[in-house]
Amino acid sequence: MRHYEIVILVHPDQSSQVPAMVERYQSMIKEKDGKVHRLEDWGRRQLAYSIDKVHKAHYLLMNIESDQGVISELENAFRYNDAVIRSLILKRDHAITKSSLIMQGAEKGKSSSKKVAAEAEASEEA
């Protein structure tokens, strides 16, 4: 079994369907004895350039371990799903389980905003 990194861009109008899509893709992987090592939902983000007159997309990142048959099935599922506007599948040497830089930045942003809010409350009380 090989390790893969998959990035999927979903049409922003279909963002509500993302959890069902993720569940479907995970079940496709697990049916064939594959493993999902990392799954990150980056949310809706601005695209660098418009794709089919769409300027934003819902981003998903998956790191999986599976065989080539599952990857072929996933490619077909992405190709024939109108909600998926782009997908990228990369072969990796090993499983990547730690948070991506985008998620680490989001977590730091949340913690720093909490610190700012706590400092503001402390200064108001003083």
UniProtKB/Swiss-Prot annotation:
InterPro entries: Ribosomal_bS6, Ribosomal_bS6_sf, Ribosomal_S6_plastid/chlpt, Transl_elong_EF1B/ribsomal_bS6. Gene3D superfamilies: 3.30.70.60. It holds the Pfam family Ribosomal_S6. The keyword Nucleotidyltransferase does not apply. Residues 104-126 are annotated as: Disordered. Keywords: Ribonucleoprotein, Ribosomal protein, RNA-binding, rRNA-binding. GO terms for molecular function: small ribosomal subunit rRNA binding; structural constituent of ribosome. It comes from the Bacteria. The keyword Chloroplast does not apply. GO terms for biological process: translation. GO terms for cellular component: cytosolic small ribosomal subunit. Disulfide bonds: none annotated. Signal peptide: none annotated. Binds together with bS18 to 16S ribosomal RNA. Belongs to the bacterial ribosomal protein bS6 family. PANTHER family: MITOCHONDRIAL 28S RIBOSOMAL PROTEIN S6, SMALL RIBOSOMAL SUBUNIT PROTEIN BS6M. This is Small ribosomal subunit protein bS6. The lineage of its organism: Bacteria, Pseudomonadati, Pseudomonadota, Gammaproteobacteria, Legionellales.
